[in-house]
Amino acid sequence: MDFKIEYTWDSFPVSHEPVRIRLNPCDKGLKMEVSAPFFNDPPAPLGEPGKPFSELWNYEVVEAFFLNNTTEQYLEVELCPHGQHLVLLLSGRRNVWKKELALSFKVSRGETHWEGEAFLPWSYFPSKVTRFNSFAIHGSNDKRVYEALYPVPQPELQQGQNPDFHRLEYFKPFSFNTLLGEEWKQPESDLWLIEKSDI
């Protein structure tokens, strides 16, 4: 399953080769591959490559969100060309209940391009994922650029509106069955069972 991020968050075409994301099933989870321009702006986070890094969204990053739009439970995955990552589990819009989960993530990087490969175990996904969106961020200060696979349509923009990747109403329908066949059923997640018992 392939996606290209061709628009800014407010529906203007991007001015560079689009970020590409590929999702493929693998043993016990999903492989997420990123192929993207490398801007090297802002500079690399100070955290160790291969490890979680808090507030990674302040750096150059590609993000994917997997949502159950009935429960508003979702998985947020952030991947950085310098090797850091951030995995968040949310229950309700912006309500993070688990963060900095471990992730198998490899990066190869040239001067102007980077590729990443992450393995997302089924246990990280909320049950019955029904919607998806993906984002890319780069640049510093007033040159900061926010891009979205499914952006806010221009007629719906409000004056002074800022980018907000948690506008779940703009996520689009998504089904793992497209990848895995109509008979496939998403494995139950022990992680999300813990979250349910805490409510």
From Swiss-Prot:
PANTHER family: UPF0462 PROTEIN, UPF0462 PROTEIN C4ORF33
UniProt family annotation: Belongs to the UPF0462 family.
Name of the protein described by the UniProt record: UPF0462 protein C4orf33 homolog
Organism listed in the record: Rattus norvegicus
Organism ancestry: Eukaryota, Metazoa, Chordata, Craniata, Vertebrata
